[in-house]
């Protein structure tokens, strides 16, 4: 498990960069200046952060936690904080309330109230790339109003509180237009460009209807069932098992199981398992300890030719 202690007690721009004030399991280092800092987590990746306005910090996230199922965060907050998460690749989840977990994936945008989320985060695919914008609404509100007079961050914060503390916007062209360009910016104009795009995003929020959004949360029991199903599917890659059998084994309807699994992992059950098998086979091939015939059997293919065809279609080579 990967532990992070978050300490955001004083001024936003002074102390948000102490996000990793105490990190267990891995060493880390922080380098940079007043406007840009790199939080290097070694083998686990890095955060690249930019101080945009008073109370607003942008962070680009690139982490790899293949050997850690969960990230536990202990936070200390003295201000009203909004978090805006955009997923470029991978999947991310965190707890909301006592028995809800929300998941989002590639292209999705999630806005949440920080102190209404709990301490456990999950990265189902073992990696995550994206960006996160931290907004101290009390510190940033007057400044943002200079540029967007009709948009009030505090009112927006209170609106989210009435909507379970979060809202999720699935990937769409509008989000891609506003957010997508942030990942590819000439170094000479980065800071100015990030400021403009941040204001554009808030302007987009000012005309977006957040009153109705889909139910995207799962209960902790549903998440546990999905995790148990995943473990069963990968612990014996040679076995053949149907969705009906899985549903019966875990006391859940077939339809609910399929929906829950896709929410967590972003793909239908057996598409996910097929890709897992082929990724595992790729590692075995690279290891050089087994023949193709042996590997095909280890990942559940009845013949080397069927395995070779599937591998070629997925990986692009044999």
Regions found by a protein language model. Give the residues of each.
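Short hydrophobic/aromatic patch on the recognition helix
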Residues: 256-257, 261, 306-307, 311
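Terminal helix-turn-helix DNA-binding modules in bacterial transcription factors
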Residues: 227-235, 240, 244-245, 263-305
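Conserved hydrophobic/aromatic pocket- or pore-lining residues that grip, position, or stack substrates
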Residues: 194, 233, 257
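Alpha-helical bundle regulatory/interaction domains
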Residues: 4-7, 95, 100-219, 226, ...
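N-terminal functional module of multi-domain proteins
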Residues: 27-127
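Short Lys/Arg-enriched alpha/beta "domain-start" segment
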Residues: 1-32
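…primarily DNA-binding HTH/wHTH and HhH modules…
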Residues: 287, 298, 308-318
């Amino acid at each position: 498990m990967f532990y992070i202690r978050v300490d955001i007690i004083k001024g936003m721009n002074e102390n948000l960069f102490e996000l990793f004030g105490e990190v267990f399991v891995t060493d880390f280092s922080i380098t940079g200046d007043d406007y840009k800092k790199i939080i290097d987590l070694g083998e686990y990746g890095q955060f690249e952060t930019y101080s945009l306005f008073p109370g607003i910090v942008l962070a680009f996230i690139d982490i790899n936690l293949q050997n850690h199922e969960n990230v536990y965060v202990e936070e200390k907050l003295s201000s009203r904080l909004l978090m805006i998460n955009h997923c470029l690749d991978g999947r991310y989840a965190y707890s909301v309330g006592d028995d809800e977990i929300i998941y989002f994936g590639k292209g999705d945008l999630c806005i949440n109230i920080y102190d209404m989320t709990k301490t456990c985060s999950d990265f189902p695919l073992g990696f995550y790339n994206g960006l996160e914008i931290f907004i101290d609404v009390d510190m940033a509100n007057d400044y943002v109003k200079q540029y967007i007079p009709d948009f009030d961050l505090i009112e927006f914060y209170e609106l989210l509180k009435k909507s379970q503390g979060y809202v999720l916007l699935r990937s769409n062209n509008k989000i891609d237009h506003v957010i997508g360009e942030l990942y590819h910016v000439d170094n000479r104009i980065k800071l100015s460009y990030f400021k403009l795009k941040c204001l554009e995003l808030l302007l987009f929020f000012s005309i977006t209807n957040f009153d109705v959004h889909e139910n995207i949360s799962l209960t902790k029991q549903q998440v546990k069932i999905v995790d148990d199903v995943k473990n069963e599917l990968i612990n014996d890659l040679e076995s053949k098992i149907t969705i009906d059998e899985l549903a019966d084994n875990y006391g859940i309807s077939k339809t609910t199981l399929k929906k829950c699994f896709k929410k967590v992992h972003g793909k239908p059950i057996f598409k996910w398992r097929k890709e897992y098998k082929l990724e595992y086979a790729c590692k075995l091939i690279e290891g050089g300890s087994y023949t193709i015939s042996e590997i095909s059997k280890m990942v559940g293919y009845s013949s080397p030719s069927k395995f070779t065809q599937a591998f070629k279609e997925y990986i692009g080579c044999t």
